[in-house]
Amino acid sequence: MPGVTEDTLYQGRVKLFQPEKGFRASTDSLVLAAALPEKLNGSALEIGCGCGGALLTAAYRLSSMQLTGVDIDAGMTALASQSVTANGFQDRVNIETGNAAEWVRDKENQFDVVFANPPYFEPGRISAPGAEKAAAYLESLSLDGWIKAMAFAVKPRAPIVIIHRAAELARILSVLDRLTGEIRVLPIASKRDEEARRVLVRGRKGLKRGQVHLLSPLITHTEDGQPSARLAAIRQGDAIDW
């Protein structure tokens, strides 16, 4: 793949190969990895793992877990596999290429946690580098289908964790409400007085419906634009207590 960079996360402790342009690891990737409960054991699945930004940092944090990442883009999974080897995670992290909805068909109730960072764009409004691949994602699986695939693969009573656009929260909750319980929502805002643009959402499969818990927002930056203490801790590998 042309235009590949070799970067590091967690202050140099995790190596990551990723495209120079297009889908790259971001704060969203680190926040998603930090949102996974620290005491998890067993197996984890990331749907739409891309080049592995969230998957590899999750593997670093959750050292007793077996992790699988699946993505439709063979170029991205090749980079993720390269990063797995560079970090010495071959015994614990498996990368596969495929359409998530098809890939999970024989994986019902298999994973102890399933997490995802679904694409944020909308049809007809894609302008970032890698637009053709972005369009392929949209055609392959809707947001509703993405969440249903996650819920299908996770074990009963186990969590699914999503980071997505805050504007899609109602849609996310409408699907999760039918499939999960103990739903928690953590808004993510750049600054204290700004509107949240992202949300972390967690639900546990098969539990009874109940109140949705809306938490105080995670603020990523100070008023002068510097990383907040919480974001700095996440970048070091700390978990989010939510």
PLM region descriptions:
Residues K21, A25, L141-A196:
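Conserved Class I SAM-dependent methyltransferase catalytic core
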Residues P118-G145, A149:
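Mobile active-site "lid"/loop adjacent to the S-adenosyl-L-methionine
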